Amino acid sequence: MSAPAEAGQRPVSTPVFRFKLNKVSAYGALNSLIVFRIIFLLKNPLFLMFTNKQKRKKTIRACTHCHRAHLLCDENRPCARCVQKGLQATCQDAPRKRKKYLLDVPPDSMQKQRYQSPEIKPEYPMNTLLPLPGQQIQRKSNFLSSAADMEYSTLSNILSENVHPFPNPSTSNEGTPNSITLSPALSPGTGGRTSTTYTAPTDIACDNALNQYVLGPTTTGISLYPDVVMAIETLKNTHPSVIHERNTRSTVSYAMGFMPDGNPHVSLPGGDYASVYAEPEDIYAKVRKPYSYTPGYHALIAYLRSRFPKQMLVKMAESMAAYRPSFIACTNALKEDDLIFMEQCFQRTLLTYDNFIKLSGTPTIVWRRTGEIAYVGDEFCVLTGWPKAELITQKKRLIVELLDDKSVVEYFELFSKIAFGDFLGATMTECTLLTSKPDVKIRTSCIWTLKRDVFGIPMMIIGNFLPI
């Protein structure tokens, strides 16, 4: 037996240990040799010359044969694959898939639109439309919404065969060009402003390519949505073929412009009733007492009793009973300063929405949780025909006065669900609006957005309406 190793000395290796160490060293040397040879081989020019394949570049547009076979094509015509297959004569670019809104447009008109300069040609005579008194056309070409302006311009340039950005005033008496809703700016403004205008024929202006009717001013008043709806109904009875031909292309749409002074806000007769306060400082300085909602509820109940039968009153009372006690319980726990702050929040939010609504171009109306109307957009007045001075006065008007019977019942049912159930409170529905003309009702698709204050109590409802 070997003597034990002294302290501090390296132990003597055994033969088994030496064998394993040599084996590991051999494997390490072999791996290093393999890696070295692989690197040398990859850097050898001869190896690269025989193994490197040229990457085929993808072309933007394949030919018809390669497109049908789902194979890569090149930019040459005929391409290499068609030359190999003997298809040189029929090798051409594959047609692109057309957009959905271009399916009804003939290809000839698209080619003509692409390579020829546009010119003005009347397509439909104006005598097929119902006359309206003294319509005026102005030179500016902007809509209330800049997004809608660009969208209408783009679609008209694509769909219309004859488009010109500025129609010649001398041709306005001969007919209606396809781009009449894009070129003139039509405004329901007051007649007190001076502007350079020229008079068009006393007919309804219509863009035949987009089936778009113009809501503009007249010498005797404002041409509003209910007027055009009545005119279209008469046109359906007198010239059904014209309406049928237009409806095959698109649904009816409406456009409204503004005065050429660059102000996107349209001033309707009766003054500016958009907001009582012009600056946020005025709100915090002048709002010194809370808003009383009790008279609003009393006025709402009195109006409902005078208009609806008992059966419908029961349904509305059931809906109101679901949220009215919650309102009372929430407000009873608040102090007077809290109630003043709630009214300041309401006016401040209304001032912010005033700027948004002026730029959106969507018919909008804002009312309190009691149904009292607090704000009316100009587009809503154009849509319904109601003057803004009549909707926003010292005597509070109610939103239920602008809805038909069925829509009023549905409104209370919907409001009872979103008042405290859904925190966001935004929902889309349909309703029927009553216009200033008793025999005209407008079916609309609307979005009701419930805005809450800092205490989580419903503060205002913003309604956006679009006719359907």
Curated annotation (Swiss-Prot):
Per the record, DNA-binding region residues lie at 63-91
**Source organism's superkingdom?**
Eukaryota
Identify a single GO molecular function assigned to this protein: zinc ion binding
Identify the Pfam families for this entry.
PAS_13, Zn_clus
User: Where is it mainly found?
Assistant: nucleus
Q: Per UniProt, which keywords does this protein have?
A: Activator, DNA-binding, Gluconeogenesis, Metal-binding, Nucleus, Transcription, Transcription regulation, Zinc
Entry-linked InterPro entries? ERT1_acuK_gluconeogen_tf, PAS, PAS_13, Zn2-C6_fun-type_DNA-bd_sf, Zn2Cys6_DnaBD
A GO BP entry is:
carbon catabolite repression of transcription
PROSITE patterns assigned to the protein according to its UniProt record, in alphabetical order: ZN2_CY6_FUNGAL_1, ZN2_CY6_FUNGAL_2
As for subcellular location, the record says: Nucleus
Which GO CC terms are listed, alphabetically? nucleus
**What are the PAS domain coordinates in residue numbering?**
349-422
Role played: Transcription factor which regulates nonfermentable carbon utilization. Activator of gluconeogenetic genes.
Q: Which family does it belong to?
A: Belongs to the ERT1/acuK family.
Q: What protein name applies here?
A: Transcription activator of gluconeogenesis ERT1
In the record, what lineage is assigned to the organism producing the protein?
A: Eukaryota, Fungi, Dikarya, Ascomycota, Saccharomycotina
